[in-house]
Amino acid sequence: MKNEKINILNLTQEELTELLVSLGLKKFYGKEVFIWLHKKITRSFDEMTNLSLKDREILKEKTYIPFFNLLKYQVSKIDKTEKFLFELEDGGTIETVLLRHKDSKNKEIRNTLCVSSQVGCPVKCSFCATGQSGYMRNLSVSEILNQIYTVERRLRKKGENLNNLVFMGMGEPLLNIDNLSKALSIISNENGINISKRKITISTSGVVSGIEKILLDKIPIELAISLHSAINEKRDKIIPINKNFPLEDLSAVLIEYQKQTKRRITFEYILIDNFNISETDANALADFIHQFDHVVNLIPYNEVEGAEHTRPSVKKINKFYIYLKNVRKVNVTLRQEKGSDIDGACGQLRQRNKKGDN
C-alpha cells in the first residue's frame, strides 16, 4: 500500500542517497534521482531512464512520488493572477497563488508564488479567512515543495519559470519551521529547482522563537512582519499570538535579526476602517519601525465573509499613507491589489469550497 512506502519527496539529497544505498542502488544514483525529482520535476520513476529497469522497479516497490489533486483553479481577468486550490492525500485543502508582474523595464514577466505552510492556521487573526476556517496540521516537506513544483511545471510549458517565493499563504510559516527549513534547503540546492534563499520571503505574525531559529541556523531569507498595529492592546485583539510575543519582544529579536543579516525588513499593515488608521495609529507605527531599515507595505483590507472588519474609504487610505510618507518620513508603499476579481484574500477560495459555493 502507498502509506507503507516512503515518500521520496520528503528527503534531502543526503537522506535520499542513504535510502538508495540501503535499497541496494549505487551511491551516485542519489544525485541522479534528486535531479529527476527536484530539477526536472518528474512524477514517474519510468522517466528516470538513466536508471536500470531493475532499479526503477525497486523504487516503485519501496517508495512513491506524491502529487496534488487540483480541486479548483481561478485566473484573474484583470492582472492574470492565478489561484490554485489543492487537495492533499488526507483530504485537507490548501491554497497557492501565482502573482504575475512585469519587471522594472516593463518587459519580462516575473512570477512570484505565494506558498502555504499549514492546513488552516492556529494564529486565528480576526481579519483572515484562513484563521476562520480552523487549523488541521503542518504541511510536510513534500506538500510545501509540491505547491512550488506543480506551478513550476505549468510555467515551463509556457517557457517561463518561478522567480520568487513568498511564504505568505495559509498558515504561520514559523510554527512549521522544521519542515519549512528542510524544504528551503531542497529548493535552494543546485541540483534542484535552485531558487536562491535571497529570493525567498517568509512572512510571520511575529513568532519570536521562529525568528530566533532563523538566526541560529543562519537561514538567509528575507523577512516580512505582519504587524497591522504597533499598539499592543489593539494588536492583541486582531492577532492573538501578540499576547505570547508582544511588540517589545518582537522589536528585540528584529533588532538582532537586522544586526546579524543587514537586511531590510518589510512590515505589512492591513488598513481596517475605524480601527488602525488614525493619526495615533500612524505615529505608533512610525515610532516602532523607525529603529529598523524598513519598508512598510500598506494593504487595504480585503473583506472576508463573517469577519466584523470593513475596508476604509479611498480618502482615508490616502490620508494615512500621505501622513506616514510626508509627515513621519516612513518608507511606505501602498500595495497594488492582485486578483481582486477572484477569491483574492488568503483562505477565501478554500472557505468557499468548504461551503460548496461555485
Swiss-Prot record:
Query: What processes in GO biological process is this protein linked to?
Result: rRNA base methylation; tRNA methylation
GO CC annotations? cytoplasm
Q: Which CDD domains match?
A: Radical_SAM (cd01335)
Q: Where is the active site?
A: 95, 346
Q: Tell me where in or outside the cell this protein is found.
A: Cytoplasm
Q: Which organism is it from?
A: Fusobacterium nucleatum subsp. nucleatum (strain ATCC 25586 / DSM 15643 / BCRC 10681 / CIP 101130 / JCM 8532 / KCTC 2640 / LMG 13131 / VPI 4355)
Its protein name is Probable dual-specificity RNA methyltransferase RlmN
Q: What Pfam families does the entry give?
A: Radical_SAM, RlmN_N
User: Membrane-spanning regions, if any?
Assistant: none
